[in-house]
């Protein structure tokens, strides 16, 4: 009996020693934590963060310049305030990596596809030819919006009746149509099976990410292997996209040196980028899927937030409608016209300020040990981010920060300083899209598409919430933010401009 007791005490002593060693050698122990930080009990902090990330990030932001929060298997360091956001942006790429941070947080090799994760052919295409050619491509986006809304909105709305619409689902379908008009063109952008594949894939990434991040790192390859959505999407999308790829490549080969009739569109640019980097053309299918994830998931959430605000604050509809009507009459449905809609731009930027897609941004993984200006030491391997929502609701940067003021940014703009406050721009105080050279490259396409959709809705529909219903609170799971599942009432109206 005494021998057994000795063994038990010895085992407890060993465990206590290991516990102390792990705690004392934690390279981030010097950074204040929100919640329990000791080994094992830190899992309680991870559980709290899953359920209450918004309040935890706010608490840390107001207490510390730099703090940490717990995920299941790691600590994430968070910097607070505009100055620290700017400092994080300026750390050179030799010392930190955006891509590795995104890989860790989104688990790209499991949630999307390993090939395009390693060779992101879509990124230079989005940064380069897509953004440069937005003006030329914009009429196709507008045309698809004009076709998609009448087809996908309930028939009762067309008869002048108020009808409840599941906004996020409907907007996701319309975003997918408009985006794929650019990604793959007609007629595939209207193919129901193809659209079902890309929409389901876009929303499965968030689902997969949540499942994988809930597992300890050692089990993630196993969990990732059994998640079916990415593999299924690559297979199903390939059925539709591969024939287009083969057709384009064959046409290029037949033309030889004379490429004057070569297609000049997103799919062609992806094919050229794959060939330039000597990748198998199968990666083009993955590039199309990644582009759809970025376009559909984020954009459908963003326009849903904007519509919820439009329905919740109907007093702002008329000034928006008057602005849109006047500009469309003068400039037509052009990219130039969209750029002149300052009130609409402000409305949507303000919506994004309070309802982004994440409570964190400007994510980086430390490649070489660094020390921040406040003296905080970050060792290699640290994941560090900026507190986006807390920055956006900081009274040092925004008057009445908790209040939705749709024309906040419109009032800040002047003719000589018009660009700095527009929806697409980032700053140290506005980091929804990230900040600096690693800010979301697709935001220029997305913002023009979303503003065109909102302009169409404001001209062609009245919207409101159901009687007695106020603007629902956003849903936070970890630091990810989604609009609540709710319906908005739509009624078609006769637009004064076409």
UniProtKB/Swiss-Prot annotation:
Listed under GO biological process in this entry are: secondary metabolic process
| Essential cofactor(s) | heme
Q: Which PROSITE patterns match?
A: CYTOCHROME_P450
Molecular-function annotations in GO:
heme binding; iron ion binding; monooxygenase activity; oxidoreductase activity, acting on paired donors, with incorporation or reduction of molecular oxygen
Listed EC numbers: 1.-.-.-
Sugar-bearing residue positions: 425
Q: In which pathway does it act?
A: Secondary metabolite biosynthesis
Record's bilayer topology term = Single-pass membrane protein
InterPro entries xrefs? Cyt_P450, Cyt_P450_CS, Cyt_P450_E_grp-I, Cyt_P450_sf
| Location of this chain's protein in the cell | Membrane
Q: Where on this chain does heme bind?
A: 440
Q: Which residues cross the membrane?
A: 7-24
A Gene Ontology cellular-component term: membrane
Where is this protein primarily located?
Answer: membrane
EC top class, as a word: oxidoreductase
Q: Which UniProt keywords apply?
A: Glycoprotein, Heme, Iron, Membrane, Metal-binding, Monooxygenase, Oxidoreductase, Transmembrane, Transmembrane helix
Tell me the function of this protein. Cytochrome P450 monooxygenase that is able to use dehydroabietic acid and testosterone as substrates for oxidation, suggesting that the natural substrate(s) may be structurally related to steroid compounds.
| Membership in a protein family | Belongs to the cytochrome P450 family.
Task: Name the chain's protein.
Answer: Cytochrome P450 monooxygenase 71
The uppermost taxa in this organism's lineage are: Eukaryota, Fungi, Dikarya, Basidiomycota, Agaricomycotina
Gene encoding it? CYP071
């Amino acid at each position: 009996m005494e021998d057994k007791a000795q063994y038990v005490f010895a085992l407890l002593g060993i465990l206590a020693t290991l516990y102390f060693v792990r705690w004392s050698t934690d390279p981030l122990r010097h950074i204040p934590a929100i919640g329990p930080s000791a080994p094992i009990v830190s899992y309680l902090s991870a559980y709290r963060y899953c359920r209450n990330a918004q309040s935890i990030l706010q608490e840390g932001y107001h207490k510390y310049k730099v703090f940490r929060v717990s995920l299941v298997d790691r600590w994430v360091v968070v910097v607070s305030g505009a100055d620290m956001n700017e400092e994080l942006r300026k750390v050179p790429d030799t010392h930190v990596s955006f891509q590795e941070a995104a890989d860790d947080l989104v688990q790209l090799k499991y949630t999307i596809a390993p090939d395009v994760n390693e060779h992101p052919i879509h990124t230079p295409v989005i940064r380069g030819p897509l953004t440069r050619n937005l003006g030329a491509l914009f009429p196709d986006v507008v045309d698809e919006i004009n076709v998609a809304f009448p087809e996908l909105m309930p028939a009762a709305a067309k008869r002048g009746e108020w009808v409840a619409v599941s906004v996020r689902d409907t907007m996701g379908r319309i975003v997918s149509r408009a985006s794929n008009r650019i990604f793959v063109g007609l007629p595939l952008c209207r193919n129901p099976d193809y659209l079902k594949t890309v929409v389901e894939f876009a929303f499965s990434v968030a689902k997969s990410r949540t499942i994988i991040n809930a597992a300890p790192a050692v089990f993630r390859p196993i969990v990732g292997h059994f998640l079916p959505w990415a593999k299924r999407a690559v297979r199903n999308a390939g059925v539709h996209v591969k024939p287009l790829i083969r057709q384009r490549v064959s046409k290029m080969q037949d033309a030889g040196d004379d490429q004057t009739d070569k297609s000049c569109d997103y799919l062609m640019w992806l094919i050229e980028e794959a060939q330039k980097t000597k990748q198998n053309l199968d990666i083009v299918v993955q590039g199309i899927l990644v582009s759809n994830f970025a376009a559909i998931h984020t954009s459908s959430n963003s326009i849903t937030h904007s519509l919820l605000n439009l329905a919740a604050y109907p007093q702002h509809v008329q000034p928006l409608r008057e602005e849109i009507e006047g500009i469309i009459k003068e400039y037509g449905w052009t990219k130039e016209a969209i750029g002149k809609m300052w009130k609409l731009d402000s409305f949507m930027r303000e919506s994004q300020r309070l309802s982004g897609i994440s409570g964190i941004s400007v994510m980086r993984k430390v490649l070489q040990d660094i020390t921040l200006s406040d003296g905080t030491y970050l060792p290699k391997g640290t994941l560090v981010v900026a507190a986006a929502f807390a920055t956006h609701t900081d009274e040092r940067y925004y008057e009445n920060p908790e209040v939705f003021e749709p024309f906040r940014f419109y009032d800040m703009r002047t003719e000589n300083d018009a660009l700095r406050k527009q929806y697409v721009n980032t700053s140290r105080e506005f980091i929804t899209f990230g900040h600096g050279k690693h800010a979301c490259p697709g935001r220029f396409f997305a913002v023009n598409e979303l503003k065109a959709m909102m302009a169409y809705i404001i001209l062609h529909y009245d919207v409101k919430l159901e009687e007695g219903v106020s603007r629902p609170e956003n849903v936070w799971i970890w630091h990810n933010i989604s609009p609540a599942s709710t319906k908005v009432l739509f009624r078609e109206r006769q637009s004064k401009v076409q």
